[in-house]
Amino acid sequence: MAEEESKPVPAEKEESLVQAGKVSQWLTENGFDHEFLAPDKNGVEIIKVSADFLLPTATALYAYGFNYLQCQGGIDLGPGQELVSMYHLIKVGDNSDRPEEVRVKVFLPRENPVVPSVYWIWKTADWQERESYDMFGIIYEGHPNLKRLLMPEDWVGWPLRKDYISPDFYELQDAY
C-alpha cells in the first residue's frame, strides 16, 4: 500500500489537473470563497462563485484593478440544468495590448435564478443584466431598473432558455 501512494502521477493525469491562476490565487490569499475552473481556449482564467459571495468577490476584483466589465451574459446549460450568470472583467491599465482578464461565473438554480446586481460596481452592467433577465429570467437583486429590454412587457417566458416553447401567435399592438 505504501508503495502505491508514493508512485508518481502519470503525465497524462498531471496535465488534466487545473492550476489556479493569478487571480484565483489572490482571492484565496485574501480569504474569498470561490472555485477555479479550467481556463478557456484563449487562456482566460475562469472562477466560480456562489451568488452569496458575488458582491464581495466582485468588489475585491474591482479593488484589485478589474475596472471594466466587458461583458455580462446568461447561459442555459440545458433543460432541467442550471443557469449561469457570467461576467468578463478586464484590468484596463498601461498595458492595453494584453490586458489581464478574468471570467466570473455564478451557477443558479433554474427554478429561482436570483443573483445580486453588480450595477453599483460597474455601471456597464445596466443593460447587460436587463438583457439576461429578459432572455433567461435571471433576477438581478438591487438593479435600479430591471425590466424587459428586447421583448414586449407582456411577453411570457424566457426566449433563450433551451426549454422555451415559442408561442404559435403573438399579437403586436399598433404603435398609433
From Swiss-Prot:
It is a peripheral membrane protein. Its EC number is 7.1.1.-. Signal peptide: none annotated. It comes from the Bacteria. It catalyses: a plastoquinone + NADH + (n+1) H(+)(in) = a plastoquinol + NAD(+) + n H(+)(out); a plastoquinone + NADPH + (n+1) H(+)(in) = a plastoquinol + NADP(+) + n H(+)(out). One of its GO terms (cellular component) is plasma membrane-derived thylakoid membrane. It is found in: Cellular thylakoid membrane. InterPro entries: NADH_DH_suC, NADH_quin_OxRdtase_su_C/D-like, NADH_UbQ_OxRdtase_30kDa_su, NADH_UbQ_OxRdtase_CS. Keywords: Membrane, NAD, NADP, Plastoquinone, Quinone, Thylakoid, Translocase, Transport. GO terms for molecular function: NADH dehydrogenase (ubiquinone) activity; quinone binding. Disulfide bonds: none annotated. One of its GO terms (biological process) is photosynthesis, light reaction. The keyword Acetylation does not apply. HAMAP family: NDH1_NuoC. NDH-1 can be composed of about 15 different subunits; different subcomplexes with different compositions have been identified which probably have different functions. Belongs to the complex I 30 kDa subunit family. PANTHER family: NADH DEHYDROGENASE [UBIQUINONE] IRON-SULFUR PROTEIN 3, MITOCHONDRIAL, NADH DEHYDROGENASE UBIQUINONE IRON-SULFUR PROTEIN 3. NDH-1 shuttles electrons from an unknown electron donor, via FMN and iron-sulfur (Fe-S) centers, to quinones in the respiratory and/or the photosynthetic chain. The immediate electron acceptor for the enzyme in this species is believed to be plastoquinone. Couples the redox reaction to proton translocation, and thus conserves the redox energy in a proton gradient. Cyanobacterial NDH-1 also plays a role in inorganic carbon-concentration. This is NAD(P)H-quinone oxidoreductase subunit J. It comes from Nostoc punctiforme (strain ATCC 29133 / PCC 73102). The gene is ndhJ.
